[in-house]
Regions:
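Electrostatic, structured charged patches in enzyme active sites and in nucleic-acid/phosphate-binding
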Residues: 1-143
Length: 143
């Protein structure tokens, strides 16, 4: 007897298109998990050179959610930005917000309410990308 294989549903979102690699921007060498991350680093270096921010760092600090034993127990922001005002904020670059990513941001609000986390989503990325012809090192990671 032949038992037909059960059809499995194709995932609604695939990460096959994401390009990652080691890049050097502004003298800082790091592993960019996506071309978006590399491009946003180039954008922050542009802002630094223009005097709009003091500095930026890639994946500088892990925030731990004390007491959480299952699921998301920590959060590693993509960037730390030191602003001219003295404020330090963290930036997350996300083209697609999955459940795990949403949980991380919700837990950040709960466990670290004083920490500023800015999200660069598709819309914000597109706004920045419109200025990419001014930004040195934009497009370092390509297929």
């Amino acid at each position: 007897m032949i038992i037909p294989l059960k059809k499995t549903k194709k995932p609604s979102h695939s990460y096959d298109h994401i390009i990652s690699g080691t890049v050097t921007i502004g003298g800082k060498t790091f592993f960019a998990r996506s071309s978006w991350e590399a491009n946003i680093a180039a954008y922050f270096e542009f802002l630094k050179n223009m005097g709009n921010i003091v500095d930026w760092r890639h994946e500088p600090k892990t925030f731990w959610f004390n007491g959480v034993r299952r699921g998301v127990v920590s959060y590693l922001p993509d960037f730390e930005i030191a602003e001219n005002s003295g404020v330090v904020k963290y930036v997350e670059v996300k083209g697609y917000m999955d459940a795990r990513s949403r949980t991380k941001l919700k837990r950040m609000k709960k466990y670290y309410p004083e920490v500023v986390v800015e999200l660069i989503d598709k819309k914000r990325y597109a706004e920045i990308a419109c200025k990419s012809h001014f930004i040195k090192n934009w497009g370092l990671l390509k297929k």
